Amino acid sequence: MSRLAKKPIVLPQGVTVEIKDNVVKVKGPKGELSQEFLPYVKIEVEGNEVWVRPNEEQIIRKSDWRKVKMFQGTYWSLIRNMVVGVTEGYKKELEIVGIGYRAQLQGNTLVMNLGYAHPVVYEIPSDVKIEVPAPNRIIVSGIDKQRVGQVAAEIRAFRPPNVYTGKGIRYVGEVVRQKEGKKA
C-alpha cells in the first residue's frame, strides 16, 4: 500500500466528490474538475473523507500488486490536487529577463517581444487565466494543476534562459546556472 494512500483526503467545506464509472468529479467554490481513472483502485467517499484503496478484483497475479500500489499513490495525489484546485487554485509566476523583452495582453492573446524579428503570439486557453502585472512578469493561474504547469512551460519554451547571459523567460525563484564565456 502506498504511504500516501494510508491517509484519507479530507474534504474542506463546500467541496463535493462524485464517483461514477471510474470518473471522479470534484466540485468546489472555484469550479469543477473531473478525471477518469483505471479500475486498479477503488475510490470511496466516507463522510468528508476520500479513501483510495486497492481493487482486489484486479489482482490476478502476485506481480499485479506492484502496479496496483503504483496507481494507488498516483491517484491519491491527483485527487488531492483536484481538491486543492477547486478550493484554492494554482498559480505559476514567470519573469522575463532581457533588454527590450516584454509581454502584454491583447484580448485573448499574450503578445511577447523576446528579441526575435517578430512578436511571439500565444493564444490563451479558456481554462487558464493569464495576468501581466508588469511588462516583465506573467502570472498563470487556474484550478487544474497540470494545465497551469503545462501553459507556464509552453510560455517559458518560447525563450528559455540563456546559459551564458541569463536572458529569457524563467520561473520566479528559478536559479539559472551561468557558464563562463570565452577567454580572450
From Swiss-Prot:
Molecular-function GO terms, alphabetical: rRNA binding; structural constituent of ribosome
Pfam families: Ribosomal_L6
Keywords noted in UniProt: Ribonucleoprotein, Ribosomal protein, RNA-binding, rRNA-binding
Top-rank taxon, per record: Bacteria
Gene Ontology CC: cytosolic large ribosomal subunit
One GO-annotated biological process of the protein: cytoplasmic translation
Chain's role: This protein binds to the 23S rRNA, and is important in its secondary structure. It is located near the subunit interface in the base of the L7/L12 stalk, and near the tRNA binding site of the peptidyltransferase center.
Subunit and interaction comment: Part of the 50S ribosomal subunit.
Similarity comment: Belongs to the universal ribosomal protein uL6 family.
Name of the protein this chain belongs to: Large ribosomal subunit protein uL6
Species of origin: Thermotoga maritima (strain ATCC 43589 / DSM 3109 / JCM 10099 / NBRC 100826 / MSB8)
Designated gene of the protein: rplF
